[in-house]
Amino acid sequence: MVSTSRIDRALRALGNTLILAAAAFSIAACAPKGPSRPPCPAGQVCIQAGNVSEPVTLDPHKSTGTWEDRIIANLLIGLTDSDEKGEAVPGMAERWETSSDGLVWTFYLRDANWSDGVPVTADDFVYSLRRILLPETASEYASVLYLIKNAQAVNEGKAPKEALGVRAISPKVLEITLNHPAPYLPELAKHHTMSPVPKHLLDKVGEKWVQPGNYLSNGPYIVTDWKLGDYVRLVKNPRFYEADKVCVDQIYLYPTPDAAMAERRVARGELDMNADIQSNRIAFLRETMPGYVRTHTFLGVTYLAFNSNVPAFKDKRVRQALAMSIDRDFITEKLLRGGQKAAYTFVPPGVANYTAAPPPAWASWPLEKRQAEARRLLAQAGYGPKNPLRFEIKHRNTPDPMLFMPAIQADWKEIGVDARLVQNEAQIAYAAFRSRDFDVADAAWIADYNDAMSFLYLQQSATGPQNYGDYRNPAYDALLAKADAEVDAQVRAGYLAQAEALMLDDAPVAPIYFYVNKNLVSPKVTGFVDNIVDQHRARYWCVAKGTPGARNSVAPKG
């Protein structure tokens, strides 16, 4: 149970933040409307969507944010794609087969074209998989493809691109050879890291291919406009292989970093949806905007990463002390109140073919006992009233971190730690995390594919920039390597759980809570199906005509 005094202390710590948030909301209420809404052509269906942040790039091999993926996934389709439920279904590959040892995968491509009419071929995939792994591409996601034979060597410049385990057997047959069995490959194949890019266009214009006007798609939409700070406009691709099944003709995706303003824009009918909701507003919105709030269990975790290059965080006792002294129940139940669950493990519940490792023993202790143990560990490490531990926490300025980070700061003050909060826009924050320019980082991770490895690989030595804290443990790496080599799903899961348990004890990260996905969607939008990976391809959307109280997005004919 959370004591009243505990709540009072945390709310006092949150005071300034809440005052500022209230002021921001008040200003939003009186502010002028967002960017003007372009007209929808007669007879067409148009959707206006809030997309949280401004994309940095629409190059699938260089993007890192979910706000970019929400655009790219509607432009480019890999060997597989997501259905309405977020599950892997055939994409460019109509079917595939694997060798008996699980190492060689053969994909048979459908007849499909780029938006300029040029056929999509196996050579496009060979070119693309080589491109993302080339050192000069500097893809921060490259390590997710290290399961492909020689991928790591190519990415590190130790082998030529031709050594990569991919080849075009014919224009419509692609072969991928892996280092180890990977039953999750069809899930991974829908991720933007495995998206094809048009080789014939890059041969002609190079890196300018990604600009609107040059960009070629093989998916349901093409990008026609990108007005910085305003919107990205997607238009239905008439050459998409299932264009006749795509209902929405145009989509405008707006950066909506101000969640309060985005909420009001949805309420006013300026936006048909927004890809986030302030957690502590969910109950209110369910009452005031019935049918709009969409929440669902989500394969995602919010956590803190400790920079192992900072002297204080080289000491396991310091990391453990900080991890155990956070009151996660207060954060999820009193602050966020959006259905999030306190996290004491790193892999979320619901991941396929996996049972999470047992949480640390302290997870079941009362907060007061955890605080006492944390003070003892800090004292052993040389910190106390005469030598307090001091550091900065860099965090995102998105709605939820703005709520819970002051509470964590207050938790650590209770054990004698002086932590200073430094907030940044999400893109800037993550750039700092990837360059390891932080002491403690507030981060979040969403599964790229439904498998425990999508989470556990983050702390692997070879992972690179996404291993924010630069954690390195040979024993952890060895357990993941054993899991990679294992064909038996149950034995593999056991190795993964051992690795997770080892990592939790080492505490290079402190899990805070498991996500729920939160979308604000007009009831008139159909085909938007809540799912565990929060993937919503626009090819399945439509607009129900005559929805009560809804803005009419379907322009009249004539």
Residue positions per predicted region:
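Aromatic- and charge-enriched surface segment that lines or borders ligand/interaction sites
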Residues: 94-142, 175, 265, 312-314
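Periplasmic-binding protein-like
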Residues: 133, 185-188, 294, 309, ...
